[in-house]
């Protein structure tokens, strides 16, 4: 009996490690991991029937959910890889984010495409993928520090830390922003460069511009103290990271100035998922 129990436990362990408990697509094919971790995520992509047969009309569906902190707007999906798939763009609804304070989860939606399986005389397996695009917003806040010459000397003498930027916080979104300054800032300085670093952290891609051949961030609005700056069409190198520099004047109202900075970044984001569909011959 102990040997039988041990055997069951070992089989269960192998199943867990191999990932065989993941959802399956139509025709018994294991579904690939879904992209999208901060913003929209794809919960499931595949056919709406478990056993597609030759010539059958079926729906391909993508179930999506907003797990970020902003409203997902202009949601749309497009099928790729599948030669007999639909070329139509499926439009989705705007999806609200979760609200933990009231215990509300992020909104979900379902994108569907009606297709007809090909005629087959033996079981054939096809690759199919979906791109889901949406507009999203990242909100970033931080504090920039500046010091007078007197305060700077005092801190050096006391061997105290002299911060440049602190408390950078990004909303739960697929693009994050880092705030960097090259040198310790002095109060009363003018035309000081502040570098914003945009990072793709969501498992997908920002919009691709066919004219410039770059992935781009549409725009970023930067509020620093009482001034508002902006950047637009920010290229993302390799789709992973982009830069924008804004210039600001530092007031000299005190020996230590703390400048709040708020960055609102707007962009289109795309996530993708792929699976396999097995089409079987008709029953005789």
Task: Specify the residue positions occupied by each region the protein language model found.
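Secretory targeting signatures
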Residues: 1-30
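Non-catalytic macromolecular-recognition regions in eukaryotic signaling proteins
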Residues: 20-284
């Amino acid at each position: 009996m102990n040997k039988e129990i041990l055997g069951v436990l070992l089989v269960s362990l192998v199943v867990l490690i191999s990932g065989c408990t993941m959802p399956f697509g139509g025709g018994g094919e294991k579904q690939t991991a879904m992209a999208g971790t901060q913003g929209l995520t794809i919960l499931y992509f595949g056919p709406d029937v478990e056993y597609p047969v030759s010539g059958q009309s079926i729906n391909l569906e993508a179930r999506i959910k907003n797990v970020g902190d902003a409203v997902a707007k202009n949601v749309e999906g497009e099928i790729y890889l599948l030669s007999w798939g639909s070329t139509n763009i499926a439009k989705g609804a705007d999806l609200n984010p979760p609200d933990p304070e009231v215990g509300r989860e992020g909104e979900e939606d379902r994108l569907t495409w009606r297709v007809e399986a090909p005629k087959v005389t033996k079981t054939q397996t096809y690759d199919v993928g979906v791109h889901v695009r949406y507009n999203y917003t990242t909100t970033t806040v931080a504090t920039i520090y500046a010091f007078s010459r007197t305060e700077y000397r005092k801190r050096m003498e006391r061997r105290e830390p002299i911060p440049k930027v602190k408390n950078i916080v990004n909303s739960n979104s697929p693009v994050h922003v880092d705030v960097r300054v090259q040198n310790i800032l002095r109060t009363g300085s003018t035309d000081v460069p502040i570098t914003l670093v945009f990072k793709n952290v969501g498992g997908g891609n920002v919009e691709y511009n066919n004219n410039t051949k770059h992935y781009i961030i549409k725009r970023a609005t930067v509020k620093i103290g009482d001034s508002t700056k902006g950047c637009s069409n920010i290229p993302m190198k390799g789709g992973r990271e982009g830069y924008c520099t804004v210039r600001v004047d530092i007031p000299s109202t005190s020996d230590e100035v703390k400048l709040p900075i708020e960055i609102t970044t707007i962009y289109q984001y795309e996530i993708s998922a792929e699976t396999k569909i097995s089409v079987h011959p008709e029953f005789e």
